[in-house]
Regions:
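Aromatic- and charge-enriched surface segment that lines or borders ligand/interaction sites
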Residues: 20-65, 80, 86, 170-171, ...
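Solvent-exposed coil/turn segments that connect beta secondary-structure elements
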Residues: 27-29, 36-38, 52, 57, ...
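Extracytoplasmic
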Residues: 17-19, 26-30, 47, 72-74, ...
Length: 255
């Protein structure tokens, strides 16, 4: 399931891929997914309810920590039909139906007799439009478009998956990635530091016009970078003290 969110209104809608339908209980106590009959893994084998249940249970107990917290709020998972699976929550939950719809589904047979939690460079068999192509441990991973992707003709897939190969390069830290951008190895950079924005963009890529420094307005929620005075602290209780600190704050020097 792919979820599309309008961050300005905090409303999300879903595009169903593996699932043909999704049903949520009126009291938000459970969510039920029905698989598309034509859903296939990249090796051509069908995606089954057993694969779905195994994926949820395995990722929820042995997968990335971000899966564990959500799984702890699931009371049980069960097949309700040859292509349907229901997850019942420990208590009514408005968020879990969305989170459960984002779980990757893996092929159970690929992992039989193996330790799922063990480190491995074996590429998992998935059901998406791309398959793992090449891996350079610690440096990069590339995905190749699957010409036999089962869902390529779904209406919701029109106009997407237009690249033959997608590559992700890894950097040890943000400074290394910024240096790669300055050298032209990275084509887009999102600057989060007001200080860098104002003082560190005089490198050749910018001065000769090969790169453009621009502000792109958007309506996504964002955090702040600044100082916040805790008025519950007696030191900041007097408004005149807070005003004095504001007057003393050298914004230009710090930024």
């Amino acid at each position: 399931t792919r979820w599309n969110c309008d961050w300005s209104s905090d409303v999300c809608s879903s595009d169903l891929r593996l699932a043909e339908t999704v049903e949520v209980a009126p009291d938000r106590q459970w969510v039920e997914f029905t698989l598309r009959e034509e859903a296939r893994f990249s090796d051509g084998s069908p995606v089954t309810v057993d694969d779905v249940i195994w994926s949820y249970e395995t990722l929820g107990t042995q997968g990335h920590p971000r899966y564990l917290a959500a799984w702890s709020r699931v009371d049980r998972i069960e097949a309700t039909g040859p292509r349907s699976v229901r997850l019942t929550f420990t208590e009514p939950d408005r968020e879990l139906p969305l989170l459960m719809g984002l779980r990757p589904i893996l092929k159970k047979a690929q992992w039989e007799g193996q330790d799922f939690a063990a480190s491995s460079l074996e590429a998992p068999i998935g059901s998406g439009a791309y398959v793992v192509d090449q891996v350079e441990p610690g440096r990069s991973i590339s995905f190749r478009r699957n010409p036999d992707y089962w869902g390529r003709d779904l209406p919701l897939m029109a106009g997407v998956n237009n690249f033959d190969v997608i590559r992700y390069d890894y950097f040890a830290d943000a400074n290394a990635m910024f240096e790669a951008f300055k050298a032209g190895a990275v084509t887009v950079w999102r600057e989060l530091s007001a200080q860098k924005w104002a003082s560190e963009y005089g490198f050749p890529l910018m001065t000769d016009g090969r790169a453009v420094q621009a502000e792109i307005p958007n309506e996504r929620p964002s955090g702040i970078v600044g100082l916040v005075m805790n008025t519950r602290n007696p030191a900041f209780a007097d408004w005149r003290v807070r005003q004095a600190l504001i007057e003393m704050f050298n914004f230009r020097f710090i930024n």
